[in-house]
């Protein structure tokens, strides 16, 4: 609870958690926010992730393998129960464990599903299942341009929305994790070839239905050191520094955010 106080003292109002933690975390989160609200103060909000373990991503499995997809679907439902204080989780599953009896759902803004996807997993899945490029669920559907991996994500999103809507009569914001390795942006042929930029995930190919009322947003990991495409792209040598600043902006963060916004993603985390 002391850490939660330090976080708010820094000026932050929202905490992101990547995976299911021990029950101590949620108990402390409940006690901290309950005390804050009783004192008439702003609580700390939570965005929760659903993790995919590294072994599954770096193994021979594709995204439709049971150890990948079914585990992701099950963990999503487990997380919903945990946040509503309706779950007991045993040791040995690669996640936190304990008796989750405190309902912290009212402070949960939404979910970020998945991790920094490995480009080889995405490419392998898309190559192996060309016939699975469509998913038409009750709460999320894919467009005609979707890939098999994006269709898998739509299924995962539809699953967590359907479960929470049906069991708890609630909905929350949903996003899918993404990062530069699998971003949907266009790069020069030289960069694409020499830097092995061969996988892409475009969440614009996943759309909500009218039944998904809460809405969704884009989640994109940005780093000051990765990728180094611009620095290593030989095409950049043909431009003066001021030309590059005008074209890309002084800040790589600013440039990437502009590119994402131009795609139509108005809300970015």
Could you describe each region identified by the protein language model?
Residues 1-34:
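Active-site-adjacent substrate/metal-binding segments within catalytic domains
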Residues 16, 35-269:
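Active-site region of glycoside hydrolase catalytic domains
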